[in-house]
A protein has these predicted regions:
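Short beta-strand edge/turn micro-motifs at domain boundaries
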Residues: 90-117
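Hydrophobic/anchoring residues in structured secondary elements
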Residues: 42, 71, 110-112
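Short, low-complexity N-terminal intrinsically disordered segments enriched in polar/charged residues
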Residues: 1-26, 30, 34, 38
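Surface-exposed, charged secondary-structure patches
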Residues: 53-96
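Short beta-strand segments enriched in hydrophobic/aromatic residues
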Residues: 36, 84-86, 111
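Short solvent-exposed beta->alpha transition segments
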Residues: 14, 33-69
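Hydrophobic pocket/interface hotspot
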Residues: 20, 32, 40, 55, ...
């Protein structure tokens, strides 16, 4: 059996992040399940969610656009941070951490905070 080599490029994390936002906007639940870890930790303002099931209980599709974001990798952990825009206004700063599992990037932590604070 030939194993696929681990993906180690910042470009792959960027593609994963864009796929996540597209799936979020289009209600592509199977894609969201593929990209978000079952044990994801999510912090949005004062709301803390633990696990993918908790996320899906509050999920509503919306369109967000990444603006000015960076990607870093250290071994099997990568992270992206920057701003998310909605209707051309900065809505949140975002930090999204990813960890490779079975040679795929999975979202394991999301932190969104109000850009006006």
């Amino acid at each position: 059996m030939i194993m696929k080599p681990p993906v180690r490029s910042e470009e792959e994390i960027s593609k994963t992040l864009l796929s996540l936002l597209n799936a979020y906007e289009t209600s592509d639940i199977p894609k969201l399940q593929e990209l978000i870890s079952r044990d994801v930790d999510i912090h949005i303002h004062e709301l803390d969610l633990y696990g993918r099931a908790a996320f899906f209980r509050i999920y509503e599709p919306e369109r967000f656009v990444l603006s000015k974001y960076s990607v870093k990798i250290d071994g099997h952990v990568g992270w992206s941070y920057g701003t998310i825009r909605k209707n051309d206004e900065v809505m949140h700063f975002s930090i999204v951490l990813r960890e490779k599992r079975r040679h795929h990037w999975k979202v394991v932590h999301v932190h969104l905070s109000d850009a006006s604070l």
